[in-house]
Amino acid sequence: MDYATFVAKAIAQDERNKFEPCSGNIDIVPDELKPFYRDYNPVDVELSVNGVGIKLCPADELSELQKEYNYINAQFIFATCNGDPIFVNNGCVYTCAHGTQEPQYEKKAESFNEYLQALVDLTC
């Protein structure tokens, strides 16, 4: 996945979307997401996909996001959609309804890169 293409599409959709390299600690971020967060930290990014907002979480808020959604037992949450977490679990990207006693994972992509590519394709 060419992250620059994703960033360009996000900014083309809404010029207020802001990315910048992350100079802080990203140890919490899984290895497969580190290149994206290191080079294109989503400081303030919300995408509209089919009329639904997807908010990518900036690096400095990731720790709090994990705590907020700890009840779903996901490996790593990196975004939300109308309050529903979007997360990486065993390499795949999933979502589930927030606030439920027994969350049912819904697979969105086979990998983080595939998920970003799908967002690029859907925001054309």
Question: Language-model segments: which ranges?
Answer:
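Structured catalytic/translocation cores of nucleotide/phosphate-coupled proteins
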Residues: C96-A97, L122-C124
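A surface-exposed partner-binding patch
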Residues: M1-V88, T123
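Short glycine-enriched loop/turn motifs at secondary-structure junctions
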Residues: S48, T100-Q101
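Compact, glycine/acidic-enriched structural inserts
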Residues: E102-T123
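Short, compact, well-ordered microdomains
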Residues: G83-P85, N89-T100
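Short, highly charged low-complexity linear segments
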Residues: S63-L65, C92-C96, A118
